[in-house]
Regions:
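Bacterial Sec-pathway N-terminal export signals of envelope proteins
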Residues: 21-65, 180-182, 215-260, 269, ...
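Amphipathic alpha-helical coiled-coil segments
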Residues: 41-56, 133, 137-156, 192, ...
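Small/polar (Gly/Ser/Thr/Ala-rich) solvent-exposed segments
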Residues: 40, 63-82, 92, 103-132, ...
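Transmembrane beta-barrel architecture of outer-membrane proteins
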Residues: 95-97, 143, 188, 271, ...
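Membrane-embedded beta-strand positions in outer-membrane beta-barrel channels/transporters
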Residues: 99-101, 145, 297-301, 345
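A short, hydrophobic C-terminal helix/tail in secreted or cell-surface proteins
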Residues: 390-394
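Periplasmic alpha-helical coiled-coil/stalk elements that build and connect Gram-negative outer-membrane
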Residues: 23, 27, 51, 133-248, ...
Length: 394
C-alpha cells in the first residue's frame, strides 16, 4: 500500500513538473497582456470617462453665481414734470450692487445629452486605440513564440545530422583500423562534425535570446528546458479582416464624428431655465429711492444664440473632411494588411516546404550511407568514395 501511494504521488509530481515546463501560445499572450505596463491604461480610460460623464450630468444641478458692481452714470431716472411744493428725491449717479443668482436649467437644447454621447464616443476611440497597441504586443509575442518553434525544429534536424555524422565517423574509424581508409578521410568527417556543432551553438544562442525576450514580455521565468506547445491551426494568428482591432478603431472614430455632427445641431437650439436673484444695493428696485435696499427677483429665462450659424457650414465641412481622412486611413490599412497576409502565407508555405525537404534530405542521406556501407563491405566502393559520398554539404 505504501509503495502504491509513493508511486501515485510521484506520478502526480512528475505530471505537475511537466505541465509547468510546457507553455502554450494563448498563455504567453495572456501573460504578456497582464504584464505589459500599458494595460493600466484601460482602468485610467474608464475612470476618465466616469469623471467626464459625472461632470456633464451636473449641468442639471442648480448653478450659483455671485456678482457685484459699482458704477457711475451720466444721468439718472427723473420725473418729466415738476410738482410745486413737492421735493421728489432721485437716485444718485453712483450706484452699487451685490447680487446672488441661482439658475436651474429646464431644457438646454440637448447639450448635456450630446456632451455625454461625445464623452462616450471619445472614450471608445481611446479604448480601441489601446486594443490596437495591445494587438501589436500580441503580434510581437507571436513572432517570438513561432520563432522558437522554428528553432526547435532546426535543432532537431541538427541533432539528426550530428547522429548521422557520428555514425559516419565511427564507420570511417573502423575502415582506418582495417587499412582501407586514411586519417584525412576521418579529418574530413571531423570538420563536418565541428561545423554542425558550431551551427547548433548559433541556433541555441538565438533560442536563448528569443526565450529571454519572451520571458520579459510574459513576466515568467523560462528556462532552456521550457517546451513550447505547437498551437492548433485555429490558434494561429487570426488574419480575418473583420477581427482586426484597427478596423474597430476606425469605426469608433467614425462614431465620434457622428456625435460631433449631432452636437452642432444642439448649438442652434434655445435654452430655457428658471432663475432667482437676491441683491443688495443702491438703488434697489425703486429707482427713485436713493438708499441701500435688499430685493429679489424670480422668473423664467429663455436664451437663443444664433452666433453658431456663422461657422455651422464650415464646421460640417471640417467633419466631412475628417471622415474622408479616416476612410482613406482604413483603405490604406486594408491594402497593407492584405499584402502582409499574402507575404506571411508565402513565408509559412516556404518554411514548411524547406523543413519537409530537410527531413527528406536526412532520410535520403541515411539511405545513401547504408547503401555505401554495404558497397564498401562488398568491395565495390572504396573508403575514400564512401567518405565523400556520405559527407553532407552544410
Amino acid at each position: 500500500m505504501d509503495m502504491k501511494r509513493t508511486v501515485f504521488f510521484f506520478t502526480l509530481s512528475l505530471a505537475a513538473m511537466l505541465a509547468h515546463a510546457q507553455l502554450t501560445l494563448e498563455e504567453c499572450q495572456r501573460r504578456a497582456q497582464d504584464n505589459y505596463p500599458l494595460v493600466r491604461q484601460y482602468g485610467l480610460i474608464e475612470k476618465a470617462r466616469g469623471y467626464d460623464l459625472s461632470n456633464a450630468g451636473k449641468g442639471y444641478l442648480p448653478q450659483f453665481s455671485l456678482s457685484g458692481k459699482a458704477t457711475y452714470q451720466s444721468d439718472i431716472t427723473r420725473l418729466p414734470v415738476e410738482i410745486p411744493n413737492l421735493d421728489i428725491k432721485t437716485a444718485s449717479k453712483d450706484q452699487y450692487q451685490v447680487m446672488l443668482e441661482v439658475q436651474q436649467t429646464l431644457w438646454d437644447g440637448g447639450d448635456i445629452r450630446s456632451r455625454k454621447r461625445l464623452t462616450c464616443a471619445a472614450s471608445e476611440v481611446e479604448l480601441e486605440k489601446q486594443h490596437v497597441d495591445m494587438y501589436a504586443l500580441t503580434d510581437r509575442v507571436n513572432q517570438l513564440f513561432f520563432g522558437i518553434l522554428l528553432l526547435d525544429e532546426q535543432l532537431k534536424q541538427n541533432s539528426l545530422l550530428q547522429e548521422d555524422l557520428g555514425r559516419t565517423h565511427k564507420q570511417v574509424a573502423d575502415y582506418i583500423a582495417n587499412g582501407i581508409a586514411t586519417l584525412s578521410d576521418l579529418d574530413a568527417v571531423s570538420v563536418e562534425q565541428l561545423n554542425t556543432r558550431q551551427h547548433r551553438v548559433e541556433l541555441e544562442t538565438t533560442r536563448r535570446a528569443y526565450l529571454s525576450m519572451l520571458a520579459a514580455f510574459t513576466g515568467k521565468d523560462l528556462s532552456s528546458e521550457t517546451v513550447l506547445l505547437k498551437p492548433a491551426a485555429e490558434e494561429n494568428i487570426d488574419r480575418q479582416m473583420n477581427n482586426r482591432p484597427e478596423l474597430r478603431w476606425y469605426d469608433a472614430q467614425g462614431e465620434q464624428l457622428h456625435q460631433q455632427e449631432a452636437a452642432l445641431n444642439t448649438r442652434l437650439m434655445p435654452r430655457f431655465g428658471l432663475f432667482v436673484q437676491g441683491a443688495y444695493g443702491n438703488p434697489g428696485l425703486n429707482m427713485l429711492k436713493d438708499e441701500f435696499n435688499a430685493y429679489y427677483m424670480a422668473g423664467v429665462r429663455m436664451s437663443w444664440n444664433f452666433g453658431s450659424l456663422y461657422t455651422l457650414k464650415n464646421d460640417r465641412r471640417r467633419i466631412d473632411n475628417t471622415r474622408q481622412q479616416i476612410e482613406t486611413g482604413r483603405d490604406v490599412f486594408l491594402f497593407n494588411i492584405r499584402l502582409q497576409a499574402t507575404q506571411q502565407d508565402a513565408g509559412i508555405v516556404s518554411m514548411r516546404r524547406q523543413m519537409a525537404d530537410d527531413d527528406e534530405i536526412i532520410r535520403l542521406r541515411g539511405n545513401i550511407r547504408r547503401a555505401a556501407e554495404a558497397k564498401v563491405q562488398n568491395g565495390t566502393m572504396t573508403a575514400v568514395s564512401y567518405t565523400h559520398l556520405t559527407l553532407p554539404t552544410i
